[in-house]
């Protein structure tokens, strides 16, 4: 008999920006952008007040400034964010040992056999959110479902400071009208390819046979087939091994930093394509350089959300170049672009029975 699974995805609300607003009362209620200023800088995070103007994580900082001229830019303090993240994780561990962190601000929890004595997954999620608020003065949203894929979608449903449950008996009804662009892993390019074939919702996807989806979209076709049916058998894995994918290029002639643009763009494309062939998503972007004197230096950046396109990866890599502080006349013999902090893509299974608490039923 298949074990009944109860999975919670907890996502802190505008985490980096919320920490800044918590610690500096003058920032509360104002549009806050967590980013270094500069032509090549990118946005780490944006408060909800800034998001109203269209500011998003991984966006070039100059664009964020154009969209929201009154935004207050705050340089990131990752040591502080990590300390808060550890507080939050300690709360998770009171309820289950099966905690899979995805980044500083989100994690999956398997509460099928909870430690805390609370039986309903919805009550566990509500308790965790209350403890986070009480102990950190921050808010979190939660999704509760029979698997990781659905829990991830559910956590976005009532943001900020809310929770949403998708019980197994409602999975089909929930997914049928869901736009394919709400499915993790379906970006603008894939959305366009699907729309060209008349596929706009998960219900449309269900009309396609597996063999036809695989013929049209290769190995990703199976993921689409499974997602449309709410299928995801991946376990919550507390000890995910960190991996990375990178591409490097050694030049025939040493180049100046300003001459590396084309190489960085090409390498970002190679790294992105290599990542697409795996079932994993990289969160941390790394730029590697080797000088003519064989000195190696790296610059890295972890946005609030993983890069969702080659263009985002490219822009972050180019922004990291601006953080290289060697003399302008320094020449380089090698450049590399990498992605690290990997986790599995969302997708791959069938739900099992789920308890539902009061006031947590899906909206029609």
Curated annotation (Swiss-Prot):
Mg(2+) binds at residues 11, 105. GO terms for cellular component: cytosol. This is DNA polymerase IV. Keywords: Cytoplasm, DNA damage, DNA repair, DNA replication, DNA-binding, DNA-directed DNA polymerase, Magnesium, Metal-binding, Mutator protein, Nucleotidyltransferase, Transferase. Monomer. InterPro entries: DNA/RNA_pol_sf, DNA_pol_Y-fam_lit_finger_sf, DNA_pol_Y-fam_little_finger, DNA_polymerase-Y, DNApol_IV, IMS_HHH_1, Rev_trsase/Diguanyl_cyclase, UmuC. It comes from Stenotrophomonas maltophilia (strain K279a). Its main location: cytoplasm. Belongs to the DNA polymerase type-Y family. It catalyses: DNA(n) + a 2'-deoxyribonucleoside 5'-triphosphate = DNA(n+1) + diphosphate. NCBIfam families: PRK02406.1.
């Amino acid at each position: 008999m298949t074990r009944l699974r109860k999975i919670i995805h907890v996502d802190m609300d505008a985490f980096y920006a919320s920490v800044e607003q918590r610690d500096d009362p003058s920032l509360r209620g104002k549009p806050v952008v967590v980013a270094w200023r500069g032509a090549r800088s990118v946005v780490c995070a944006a408060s909800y007040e800034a998001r109203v103007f269209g500011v998003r994580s991984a966006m070039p900082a100059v664009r964020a400034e154009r969209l929201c001229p009154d935004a207050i830019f705050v340089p990131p303090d990752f040591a502080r964010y990590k300390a808060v993240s550890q507080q939050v994780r300690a709360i998770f561990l009171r309820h289950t040992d099966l905690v899979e962190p995805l980044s500083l601000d989100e994690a999956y929890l398997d509460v099928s056999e909870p430690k805390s004595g609370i039986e309903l997954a919805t009550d566990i999620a509500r308790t965790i959110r209350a403890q986070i608020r009480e102990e950190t003065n921050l808010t979190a949203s939660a999704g509760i479902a029979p698997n990781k894929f659905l829990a991830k979608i559910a956590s976005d449903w009532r943001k900020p400071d809310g929770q949403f449950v998708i019980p197994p008996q409602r999975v089909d009804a929930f997914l049928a009208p869901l736009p394919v662009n709400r499915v993790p892993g379906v970006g603008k390019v894939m959305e366009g390819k699907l729309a060209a074939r008349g596929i706009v919702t998960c219900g449309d996807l269900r009309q396609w046979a597996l063999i036809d989806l695989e013929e049209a979209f290769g190995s990703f076709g199976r993921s689409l087939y499974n997602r449309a049916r709410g299928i995801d058998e991946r376990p919550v894995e507390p000890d995910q091994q960190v991996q990375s994918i990178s591409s490097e290029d050694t030049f025939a002639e040493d180049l100046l930093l300003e001459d590396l643009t084309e190489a960085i763009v090409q390498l970002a494309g190679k790294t992105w394509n290599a990542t697409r062939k795996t079932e994993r998503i990289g969160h941390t972007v790394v730029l590697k350089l080797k000088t003519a004197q064989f000195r190696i230096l790296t610059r890295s950046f972890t946005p609030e959300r993983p890069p969702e396109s080659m263009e985002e990866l490219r822009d972050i890599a180019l922004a990291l170049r601006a953080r290289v502080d060697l003399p302008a006349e320094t020449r380089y013999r090698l450049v590399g672009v990498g992605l690290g902090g990997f986790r599995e893509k969302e997708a791959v299974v069938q739900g099992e029975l789920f308890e539902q608490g009061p006031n947590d039923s899906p909206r029609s």
